């Protein structure tokens, strides 16, 4: 939790625009996880979910509060973004905020299961791309090539089209 606060506070210091600040924060978070030797060491939240019967009610409550706090932090970022950049499609911001938590926790689990520390980084960057496309103004999106289009593919389309 502390690392999320530090990362997104730093991003807010770097950029006043709420969308750009959130995108910078996600990129910084991905970079931090990419720099961890051997990937993220694990996730207490995921462990508690899978082994719930091994933990007492106090630990389960702390887990719930931590998740709610993380979701609320993401929700505040998304509210600030939506106030400036209306979403491309109607979407519940609580769902989008929870998705960030799911991406991070799920990315940690996927990285461990697949023995590939890059999975977490790719999941965060994928969520970042989704947020960018969902909240970017339409005219800005019109100037961007579709995802996964390389310069060579783009040039081939122009020549053959």
Segments the model singles out, each with a brief description of its role:
Residues 52-57, 67-96, 132-141, 149:
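Hydrophobic alpha-helical bundle segments that form small-molecule/ligand-binding pockets
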Residues 32, 36, 101-118, 130-140:
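Amphipathic C-terminal alpha-helical segment
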Residues 15-19, 56-59, 63, 89-93, ...:
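Residue-level recognition of alpha-helical structural elements
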Residues 1-4, 18, 22-25, 66, ...:
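Hydrophobic/aromatic residues within well-ordered alpha-helical segments
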Residues 137-161:
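C-terminal effector-binding regulatory domain of bacterial HTH transcription factors
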